Protein backbone atom coordinates (compact mmCIF):
# COMPACT_ATOMS: atom_id res chain seq x y z
CA UNK A 1 0.00 0.00 0.00
CA UNK A 2 1.35 3.41 -0.96
CA UNK A 3 2.71 5.57 1.84
CA UNK A 4 0.96 8.68 0.49
CA UNK A 5 -2.63 8.49 -0.68
CA UNK A 6 -3.15 9.97 -4.15
CA UNK A 7 -5.39 13.03 -4.12
CA UNK A 8 -8.68 13.30 -5.95
CA UNK A 9 -9.67 16.07 -8.34
CA UNK A 10 -11.86 17.66 -5.68
CA UNK A 11 -8.90 17.95 -3.31
CA UNK A 12 -6.57 20.01 -5.52
CA UNK A 13 -6.47 23.80 -5.63
CA UNK A 14 -8.73 25.44 -8.24
CA UNK A 15 -5.75 26.73 -10.21
CA UNK A 16 -4.51 23.16 -10.68
CA UNK A 17 -7.73 21.70 -12.05
CA UNK A 18 -6.90 22.42 -15.71
CA UNK A 19 -3.48 20.76 -15.32
CA UNK A 20 -5.11 17.84 -13.53
CA UNK A 21 -7.57 17.41 -16.40
CA UNK A 22 -4.77 17.47 -18.98
CA UNK A 23 -2.81 14.85 -17.02
CA UNK A 24 -5.98 12.75 -16.90
CA UNK A 25 -6.37 13.11 -20.66
CA UNK A 26 -2.74 12.50 -21.69
CA UNK A 27 -1.41 10.28 -18.90
CA UNK A 28 -4.45 8.50 -17.40
CA UNK A 29 -2.44 5.35 -16.69
CA UNK A 30 -0.01 7.35 -14.49
CA UNK A 31 -2.81 8.62 -12.27
CA UNK A 32 -1.31 7.37 -9.00
CA UNK A 33 1.95 9.16 -9.76
CA UNK A 34 0.68 12.62 -10.66
CA UNK A 35 -2.13 12.47 -8.10
CA UNK A 36 0.46 11.71 -5.42
CA UNK A 37 2.71 14.52 -6.62
CA UNK A 38 -0.33 16.81 -6.37
CA UNK A 39 0.24 16.91 -2.61
CA UNK A 40 2.76 19.58 -3.61
CA UNK A 41 1.25 22.15 -6.00
CA UNK A 42 4.78 23.16 -6.97
CA UNK A 43 5.80 19.63 -7.89
CA UNK A 44 2.76 18.73 -9.98
CA UNK A 45 2.73 22.13 -11.68
CA UNK A 46 6.37 22.14 -12.72
CA UNK A 47 7.10 18.44 -13.19
CA UNK A 48 3.94 17.49 -15.01
CA UNK A 49 3.69 20.79 -16.83
CA UNK A 50 7.17 20.07 -18.16
CA UNK A 51 6.32 16.48 -19.14
CA UNK A 52 3.26 17.66 -21.03
CA UNK A 53 5.33 20.31 -22.82
CA UNK A 54 7.94 17.72 -23.79
CA UNK A 55 5.27 15.41 -25.15
CA UNK A 56 3.81 18.23 -27.27
CA UNK A 57 6.97 19.95 -28.43
CA UNK A 58 10.10 17.82 -28.07
CA UNK A 59 12.05 17.02 -31.27
CA UNK A 60 13.23 13.79 -29.63
CA UNK A 61 11.66 10.65 -31.05
CA UNK A 62 9.25 9.15 -28.50
CA UNK A 63 10.91 5.77 -29.06
CA UNK A 64 14.24 7.19 -27.90
CA UNK A 65 12.69 8.45 -24.67
CA UNK A 66 11.09 5.06 -24.03
CA UNK A 67 14.35 3.21 -24.69
CA UNK A 68 16.24 5.34 -22.17
CA UNK A 69 13.47 5.13 -19.58
CA UNK A 70 13.28 1.33 -19.73
CA UNK A 71 17.05 0.90 -19.46
CA UNK A 72 17.30 2.97 -16.29
CA UNK A 73 14.03 1.72 -14.78
CA UNK A 74 15.18 -1.89 -14.98
CA UNK A 75 18.52 -1.09 -13.37
CA UNK A 76 16.93 0.94 -10.56
CA UNK A 77 14.30 -1.81 -10.19
CA UNK A 78 11.25 0.41 -10.47
CA UNK A 79 8.32 -1.93 -11.11
CA UNK A 80 5.97 1.03 -11.47
CA UNK A 81 7.91 2.62 -14.34
CA UNK A 82 8.74 -0.70 -16.01
CA UNK A 83 5.06 -1.67 -15.95
CA UNK A 84 3.96 1.65 -17.46
CA UNK A 85 6.70 2.12 -20.02
CA UNK A 86 6.86 -1.42 -21.40
CA UNK A 87 3.53 -1.04 -23.26
CA UNK A 88 4.46 2.52 -24.23
CA UNK A 89 7.73 1.26 -25.72
CA UNK A 90 5.89 -1.44 -27.63
CA UNK A 91 3.51 1.25 -28.83
CA UNK A 92 6.40 3.10 -30.50
CA UNK A 93 7.12 0.04 -32.64
CA UNK A 94 9.74 -1.71 -30.54
CA UNK A 95 9.43 -5.49 -30.61
CA UNK A 96 9.03 -7.75 -27.59
CA UNK A 97 12.59 -9.00 -28.17
CA UNK A 98 13.94 -5.44 -28.15
CA UNK A 99 12.09 -4.60 -24.94
CA UNK A 100 13.44 -7.76 -23.31
CA UNK A 101 16.96 -6.75 -24.37
CA UNK A 102 16.53 -3.36 -22.68
CA UNK A 103 15.76 -5.21 -19.44
CA UNK A 104 19.25 -6.72 -19.40
CA UNK A 105 21.61 -4.32 -21.16
CA UNK A 106 21.83 -1.80 -18.32
CA UNK A 107 23.96 -4.16 -16.26
CA UNK A 108 26.57 -4.76 -18.96
CA UNK A 109 30.12 -3.50 -18.47
CA UNK A 110 31.24 -0.22 -20.02
CA UNK A 111 34.15 -0.57 -22.45
CA UNK A 112 36.82 1.99 -23.33
CA UNK A 113 34.36 3.85 -25.55
CA UNK A 114 31.56 3.89 -22.99
CA UNK A 115 29.60 1.26 -24.91
CA UNK A 116 28.84 -2.46 -24.86
CA UNK A 117 29.47 -2.80 -28.58
CA UNK A 118 26.62 -3.67 -30.91
CA UNK A 119 23.04 -3.56 -29.71
CA UNK A 120 21.31 -6.20 -31.85
CA UNK A 121 18.10 -5.13 -33.51
CA UNK A 122 18.59 -1.41 -32.84
CA UNK A 123 19.66 1.24 -35.34
CA UNK A 124 22.54 3.65 -34.75
CA UNK A 125 20.53 6.37 -33.01
CA UNK A 126 18.71 3.87 -30.80
CA UNK A 127 21.98 2.18 -29.85
CA UNK A 128 23.45 5.52 -28.89
CA UNK A 129 20.47 6.27 -26.65
CA UNK A 130 21.04 2.91 -24.94
CA UNK A 131 24.69 3.83 -24.38
CA UNK A 132 23.69 7.22 -22.99
CA UNK A 133 21.25 5.70 -20.49
CA UNK A 134 23.80 3.11 -19.42
CA UNK A 135 26.54 5.70 -19.03
CA UNK A 136 24.36 7.94 -16.86
CA UNK A 137 23.78 5.04 -14.49
CA UNK A 138 27.36 3.83 -14.59
CA UNK A 139 28.92 7.26 -14.04
CA UNK A 140 26.50 8.19 -11.27
CA UNK A 141 26.24 4.89 -9.41
CA UNK A 142 28.71 2.21 -10.38
CA UNK A 143 31.91 4.03 -11.25
CA UNK A 144 32.23 5.76 -7.85
CA UNK A 145 31.43 2.53 -6.00
CA UNK A 146 34.03 0.66 -8.05
CA UNK A 147 36.68 3.31 -7.45
CA UNK A 148 36.99 4.26 -11.11
CA UNK A 149 39.27 7.27 -11.47
CA UNK A 150 37.41 10.53 -12.23
CA UNK A 151 39.69 11.08 -15.22
CA UNK A 152 38.52 7.83 -16.77
CA UNK A 153 34.88 8.85 -16.32
CA UNK A 154 35.66 12.28 -17.79
CA UNK A 155 37.31 10.80 -20.88
CA UNK A 156 34.45 8.37 -21.48
CA UNK A 157 31.92 11.17 -21.04
CA UNK A 158 33.67 13.27 -23.68
CA UNK A 159 33.77 10.37 -26.14
CA UNK A 160 30.10 9.70 -25.61
CA UNK A 161 29.23 13.37 -26.07
CA UNK A 162 31.15 13.49 -29.35
CA UNK A 163 29.06 10.57 -30.59
CA UNK A 164 25.85 12.26 -29.43
CA UNK A 165 26.80 15.55 -31.09
CA UNK A 166 27.34 13.76 -34.40
CA UNK A 167 23.76 12.45 -34.43
CA UNK A 168 21.59 14.77 -32.34
CA UNK A 169 21.03 18.53 -32.07
CA UNK A 170 21.97 20.37 -28.85
CA UNK A 171 18.29 20.58 -27.93
CA UNK A 172 17.80 16.86 -28.48
CA UNK A 173 20.87 16.06 -26.38
CA UNK A 174 19.67 18.27 -23.52
CA UNK A 175 16.17 16.81 -23.54
CA UNK A 176 17.42 13.23 -23.79
CA UNK A 177 19.79 13.71 -20.87
CA UNK A 178 17.24 15.61 -18.80
CA UNK A 179 14.46 13.08 -19.34
CA UNK A 180 16.77 10.14 -18.61
CA UNK A 181 18.18 11.58 -15.39
CA UNK A 182 14.69 12.70 -14.40
CA UNK A 183 13.52 9.12 -14.81
CA UNK A 184 16.02 8.00 -12.16
CA UNK A 185 14.44 10.52 -9.78
CA UNK A 186 10.99 9.15 -10.63
CA UNK A 187 12.25 5.62 -9.99
CA UNK A 188 13.52 6.46 -6.51
CA UNK A 189 10.45 8.58 -5.71
CA UNK A 190 8.12 5.71 -6.63
CA UNK A 191 10.14 3.16 -4.70
CA UNK A 192 10.38 5.29 -1.56
CA UNK A 193 6.63 5.93 -1.52
CA UNK A 194 5.81 2.32 -2.50
CA UNK A 195 3.59 3.59 -5.28
CA UNK A 196 0.94 1.08 -6.37
CA UNK A 197 0.21 0.49 -10.05
CA UNK A 198 -3.23 1.52 -11.23
CA UNK A 199 -5.88 -1.20 -11.52
CA UNK A 200 -5.79 -1.08 -15.32
CA UNK A 201 -1.99 -1.44 -15.51
CA UNK A 202 -0.48 -4.91 -15.91
CA UNK A 203 2.43 -5.38 -13.53
CA UNK A 204 5.67 -6.12 -15.37
CA UNK A 205 8.35 -7.11 -12.89
CA UNK A 206 11.80 -5.76 -13.69
CA UNK A 207 14.66 -8.22 -14.15
CA UNK A 208 16.19 -8.48 -10.69
CA UNK A 209 19.14 -10.46 -12.07
CA UNK A 210 20.53 -7.45 -13.90
CA UNK A 211 21.67 -4.03 -12.81
What is the predicted role of each segment?
Residues 1-211:
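Hydrophobic alpha-helical segments
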Amino acid sequence: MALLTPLTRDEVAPDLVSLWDECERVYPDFRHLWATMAHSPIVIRHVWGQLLDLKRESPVDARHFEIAILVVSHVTRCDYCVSHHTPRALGTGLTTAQVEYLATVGGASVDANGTVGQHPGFDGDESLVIDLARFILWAGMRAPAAGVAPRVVHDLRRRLFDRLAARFSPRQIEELIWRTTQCVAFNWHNDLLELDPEAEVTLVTRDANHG
